[in-house]
């Protein structure tokens, strides 16, 4: 009997602390399980989902995220990271991108729900070419109209400067050279380095945006209800 009591005591002494410790190992978050340490301060930092070609929560869009995306492109003389926050109350579906010069290594995010933001990048063509990253992207909105965003990061800053623009077109309209020329030359393009606010004139929407002035350009735009 005495041997049984000693055995029971040793069993309980070993098993009880282990059982309590396990309660701190697994924490549920939604439908996922994350393995954590007992000390919450030692939890691993979550990896950011902010990569070019992705859609993130609109509230997360900031210039520092665009800086991170630019760093991932590498050493290219002319490049741009674009973030467009959809606070329009509408769903956006990608149409296309037209390039006056340059290209992109990522696909334009296909769907952007309300309260989400799209991330996109463009760069000058590879090789020793004196070209910039210049073009326009287009999204069809659930209202039936088209949202167009023009961006221009020129190669020669002696003659040109960074410009951007936004316009809502009636109906579905794919980006092309005509759209680019209109937004660059005839629709009051926006200069860099200052925050711009503008009524877009359709669907009860307005914009708020900012573009940096250097060759590693960042363009952040919020499309909101007026």
From Swiss-Prot:
Residues 58-77 are annotated as: N-terminal region. GO terms for molecular function: channel activity; toxin activity. Pfam families: Anemone_cytotox (PF06369). Residues 1-21 form the signal peptide. Phosphocholine binds at residues 101, 134, 152, 154, 180, 184. Keywords: Cleavage on pair of basic residues, Cytolysis, Ion transport, Membrane, Nematocyst, Secreted, Signal, Target cell membrane, Target membrane, Toxin, Transmembrane, Transport. The record marks 160 as: Important in the initial contact with the lipid membrane. Residues 50-59 are annotated as: Plays an important role in the hemolytic activity. SUPFAM superfamilies: Cytolysin/lectin (SSF63724). Its main location: secreted. The keyword S-adenosyl-L-methionine does not apply. Gene3D superfamilies: Cytolysin/lectin (2.60.270.20). Residues 22-45 form a propeptide. One of its GO terms (biological process) is pore complex assembly. One of its GO terms (cellular component) is extracellular region. It is found in: Secreted; Nematocyst; Target cell membrane. The keyword Ion transport applies. Residues 152-167 are annotated as: Trp-rich region, which is important for the binding to lipid membrane. It comes from the Eukaryota. Pore-forming protein that forms cations-selective hydrophilic pores of around 1 nm and causes cytolysis. Pore formation is a multi-step process that involves specific recognition of membrane sphingomyelin (but neither cholesterol nor phosphatidylcholine) using aromatic rich region and adjacent phosphocholine (POC) binding site, firm binding to the membrane (mainly driven by hydrophobic interactions) accompanied by the transfer of the N-terminal region to the lipid-water interface and finally pore formation after oligomerization of monomers. Belongs to the actinoporin family. Sea anemone subfamily. Composed of a long N-terminal alpha-helix and a core region rich in beta-sheet structures. Before the pore formation, the alpha-helix binds the lipid membrane, partitions into the lipid-water interface and stabilizes the monomeric molecule on the membrane. Finally, it traverses the bilayer, thus forming the transmembrane pore. Octamer or nonamer in membranes. Monomer in the soluble state. This is DELTA-thalatoxin-Avl1a.
């Amino acid at each position: 009997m005495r041997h049984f009591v000693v055995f029971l005591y040793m069993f309980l002494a070993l098993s009880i602390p282990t059982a309590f410790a396990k309660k701190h190992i697994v924490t549920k978050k939604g439908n996922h399980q994350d393995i954590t340490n007992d000390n919450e301060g030692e939890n691993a930092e979550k990896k950011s989902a902010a990569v070019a070609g992705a859609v993130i929560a609109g509230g997360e869009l900031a210039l520092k995220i665009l800086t991170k995306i630019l760093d991932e492109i590498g050493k290219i003389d002319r490049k741009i990271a674009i973030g467009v926050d959809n606070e329009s109350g509408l769903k956006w579906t990608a149409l296309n991108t037209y390039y006056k010069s340059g290209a992109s290594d990522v696909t334009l995010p296909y769907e952007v729900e309300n309260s989400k933001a799209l991330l996109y990048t463009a760069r000058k063509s590879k090789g020793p070419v004196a070209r910039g990253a210049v073009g326009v992207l287009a999204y069809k909105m659930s209202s039936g109209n088209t949202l167009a965003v023009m961006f221009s990061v020129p190669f020669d800053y002696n003659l040109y400067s960074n410009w951007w623009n936004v316009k809502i077109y009636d109906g579905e309209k794919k980006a092309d050279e005509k759209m680019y020329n209109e937004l660059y030359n005839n629709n009051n393009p926006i200069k860099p380095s200052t925050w711009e606010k503008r009524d877009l004139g359709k669907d009860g929407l307005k914009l708020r945006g900012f573009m940096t002035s250097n060759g590693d350009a960042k363009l952040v735009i919020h499309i909101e209800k007026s």
